[in-house]
A protein has these predicted regions:
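Alpha/beta-hydrolase
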Residues: 77, 113-115, 206, 268
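C-terminal catalytic histidine-bearing segment of alpha/beta-hydrolase fold enzymes
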Residues: 262-304
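Primarily recognizes the serine-hydrolase "nucleophile elbow" in alpha/beta-hydrolase
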Residues: 152-224
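The conserved beta1-alpha1 loop
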Residues: 77-79, 239-240
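N-terminal cap/lid segment of alpha/beta-hydrolase-fold proteins
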Residues: 41-68
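The feature captures the conserved acid-bearing segment of alpha/beta-hydrolase catalytic domains
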Residues: 202, 208-264
């Protein structure tokens, strides 16, 4: 008797399932020795990891490229964002996912750290924007600017240093070949990390201090000028010309030039139509900066 259509579908599905199981087993027998030898498969989805920092348990997204490890790696530091969950018009996880493939295709592992109060670490403390607005409402603008500097030097820098320590001990990562990159407030943090850890191979700051901090706070200017002066790593400074201000990158580059320290300054044509668009060029215009940034990273980070 002929099988019913339902039975045929079930049989076909069952056969396909057995085939998938055999394929998975076969791939498993291949993958295990490859992983043992340090060969990994490129990740289409990130691994969500937890990074301890004092009493905090920060979340981060980690991608690794395909091929033979250990890999050079990038620790990326986001800015303060438009709110606790968003940056550049995207959720923070979407923003991380937009950047990761750019780094993976150049052979770099990519760790996107969520600091307290933001993104996947929103439950680990207050959002920095709320903290600074409250300080300004209670004590005034000058007090808020000073608090931002204090947090930059202490709590938030500690979090990034914890992320760096985590990355250095992660399987498949070459602890000797790590770059630190940051955007906006995260760009400031990247410069302070370069001052703190002489083993960082390179630093890239996108739009660091461009959102009013440079003009409004002499303390921030002094802190960042001292940081680039003390940093051992080569530094790249990147902005779009329609950012709020390009003075931070130009002034920091002038200081590096005065000190005869290796650096690269790139001011690109306008991105989008507004200062917000220009400020978020790291996310909105990856094709604009990709070639220059990876030429810099490949020179200073990739070599063993």
């Amino acid at each position: 008797m002929a099988a019913s259509p339902v039975a045929e579908v079930w049989a076909s599905s069952n056969a396909k399932a057995r085939g998938r199981a055999l394929t998975a087993a076969w791939l498993g027998w291949i993958a295990f020795p490859l992983l043992f030898l340090g060969i990994s498969f490129s990740q289409s989805a990130p691994q969500t990891v937890t990074i301890p920092c004092g009493n905090l348990h920060l979340k981060a997204l980690l991608w690794k490229p395909g091929g033979i490890g250990p890999f050079p790696a990038v620790l990326f530091n986001h800015g303060s964002g438009s709110d606790a969950e968003h940056t550049a018009g995207m959720t923070m996880t979407e923003a991380a996912g937009k950047l990761a493939p750019v780094f993976l295709r150049h052979g770099y592992a990519f760790l996107y750290l969520f600091r307290r109060g933001q993104g996947l670490s929103a439950d680990q403390g207050s959002y920095i924007g709320d903290v600074l607005r409250h300080e300004e409402a209670v004590k005034g603008a000058e007090a808020s600017q000073h608090l931002q500097l204090v947090l930059l030097r202490t709590d938030y820098l500690d979090e990034v240093m914890s992320g760096l320590a985590f990355l250095k001990t992660t399987s498949g990562i070459d602890a000797r070949r790590i770059a630190v990159i940051g955007h906006s407030f995260g760009g400031q943090l990247a410069l302070l990390v370069a001052q703190r850890d002489p083993k960082v191979r390179a630093t890239v700051a996108f739009d660091g201090a461009a959102h009013h901090s440079w003009q409004r706070s002499a303390e921030v200017r002094e802190e960042l000028l001292n940081a680039v002066g003390n940093a051992a790593a080569p530094i790249m400074l990147v902005q779009a010309s329609n950012d709020y201000s390009t003075a931070p990158s130009r002034d920091l580059a002038a200081e590096l030039e005065r000190l005869h320290k290796p650096h690269v300054l790139r001011i690109y044509p306008p991105v989008g139509r507004t200062p917000d668009d220009g400020h978020d060029a790291v996310y909105l215009a990856t094709t604009v900066w990709e070639e220059d940034v990876f030429q810099f990273l490949d020179k200073y980070v990739k070599p063993n």
